[in-house]
Curated annotation (Swiss-Prot):
It comes from the Eukaryota. Residues 457-483 are cytoplasmic. Residues 408-418 have a biased composition (Basic and acidic residues). The gene is Lrp11. This is Low-density lipoprotein receptor-related protein 11.
Length: 483
């Protein structure tokens, strides 16, 4: 493609330099014993291209061919394979194996880097040899043998190994003629990436935020782009930031449900998406010690939990639904209604009986007055007068007639019973829990008394049977023996 000035564009020059680099892989390298040939224009062009790439990309991302030295023929390969040495470089084992590379073996009988390269050249699938050099010249003689590691970095027709700079190691990359002449992989061999947005998250307010991590996404080659988008939720209720590729930090979250989508793109443009939900719940209600383990010493809330019975009716709502205080208000209202009903239905003679216990004549006069009063006495007056004590000088005893004395006496007894029953209604009946132990104790006591009585009777009978023989009985028996 040409630029506006008519000259070749940067893309054209980049493709041309790449073609020249592949062409140079076919050129035989100089022998170790031969003098170096004068550099040609192509070599100078390749060196300039190598320097430009080194300035544009960090060292750990460069291919070993661009960082290495001159190419040399593999020993015993007949010119079909060449190797290049890359000093101070080591293979990134985990990343390389994850990308498709494989570890072959570690020869233990090598005495130098040449034997390690020879072992790799003799291995048909070996493409990278890593040599661990001895630690500096300060090591006393004899020098220890270096360690050698062989890898197969070719997968799907391309090199997939990753490298990193590290002193004390040297990497040797092999290029074979059949690899250079191989057919590039077809697009259908490149599998699409697998997107993993992580597990769903549930938060409670207040919260500082959460970090979504999608770096578990994978691809058979490489993922070049991570994209996070909000699919559901109010965008103004959350702040989204990307601290590093593959992650998303959420802050200032408000109550609600959010759905985020992670889309990953591989090196050939294939995409994959995955969703993750973030649920933000409101601040949990403080139950004030409301527990699910309840006993008879607890107050049962309407919501199902319970609190200490001493905390009920203290003016503070410990139950989540406030039933501990509502119950007390209803209980106080019921007590007022019961007291009002009893006081309203009471007759004037009730207070006269309680207040005039010391005077029998007063009791009779009150009973007679009660039965002789008309039925049209108003309740307010009854309630007012029942709370006041009349002086004895104002009370006139009334003697009942002889004909109606028995009837009045029976009615008076009935009134006493009914009034005593009404007075007893104001006090709560004893609980069943107290009556049951009392009845059980009485039954056990009676049973023990019966057992003791039976035991005493048996003992008395045995004593009667075992009483000693009198002198008269003994004489009778002796005389009977001689007769």
């Amino acid at each position: 493609m040409a630029t506006r000035g008519g000259g070749p564009g940067p893309g054209f020059r980049h493709r041309a330099l790449r073609g020249l680099l592949l062409l140079c892989l076919w050129l035989p390298g100089s022998r170790p014993g031969e003098p170096a040939a004068p550099s040609s224009g192509v070599d100078r062009l390749l060196q300039d291209f190598r320097r430009q790439l080194q300035r544009a990309r960090p060292r750990e991302e460069l291919e070993p061919e661009l960082l290495g030295g001159p190419r040399e023929d593999c020993p015993g390969a007949g010119g079909t394979a060449v190797y290049r040495a890359v000093p101070d470089t080591i293979i990134r084992t985990q990343d390389s194996i994850a990308a498709g590379a494989s570890f072959l073996r570690a020869p233990g009988s090598v005495r130098g880097w040449r034997q390690c390269v020879t072992a790799c050249c003799s291995e048909p699938s070996c493409s990278v040899a890593v040599v661990q050099l001895p630690r500096g010249p300060s090591v006393p003689a004899p020098m220890p043998a270096p360690r050698c590691y062989l890898f197969n970095c070719t997968a799907r027709g391309r090199s997939v190994c990753k490298f990193a700079p590290l002193r004390g190691y040297r990497t040797y990359t092999l290029s074979r003629a059949e690899d250079a002449a191989g057919i590039p992989p077809r697009p259908d061999e490149d599998k699409p990436p697998v997107s993993k947005a992580g597990k769903d998250v549930v938060l409670h307010l207040p919260t500082d935020g959460v970090v979504l991590d999608g770096r578990e996404s994978s691809d058979d080659h490489a993922i070049v782009l991570y994209e996070w988008t909000l699919q559901q939720g109010d965008p103004s209720s959350v702040d989204m930031k990307v601290p590093q590729p593959g992650t998303l930090r959420l802050s200032r979250l408000k109550e609600g449900a959010y759905i985020f989508q992670l889309t990953v793109t591989d090196s050939v443009g294939q995409r994959s998406s995955d969703n993750v939900s973030v649920t933000v719940l409101p601040r949990p209600y403080s139950t004030g010690g409301c527990s699910s383990a309840c006993s008879r010493y607890h107050f049962f809330c309407d919501s199902g939990c319970c609190i200490d019975i001493a905390l009920a009716c203290d003016g503070v709502r410990q139950c989540p639904d406030g039933s501990d205080e509502d119950f007390c208000q209803n209980l106080a209202l019921d007590r007022k209604l019961v007291t009002h009903t009893v006081a309203t239905s009471a007759q004037p003679g009730a207070m006269g009986l309680n207040e005039g216990e010391g005077d029998p004549k007063l009791e009779k006069s009150q009973r007679a007055t009660t039965h002789n009063q008309p039925a049209t006495v108003s309740h307010p007056e009854t309630r007012i007068h029942s709370t006041q004590k009349a002086p004895e000088s104002q009370i006139n005893p009334v003697q009942p007639d002889s004909n109606s004395s028995g009837k009045n006496q029976e009615e008076g007894n009935y009134d006493l019973k009914s009034k005593s029953g009404q007075a007893g209604g104001e006090h709560p009946a004893p609980e069943a829990g107290a009556v049951l132990p009392l009845a059980l104790g009485l039954a056990i006591t009676v049973l023990l008394l019966l057992m003791v009585t039976c035991r005493l009777r048996l003992v008395k009978q045995k004593l009667k049977k075992a009483r000693p023989i009198t002198s008269e009985e003994s004489d009778y028996l002796i005389n009977g023996m001689y007769l």
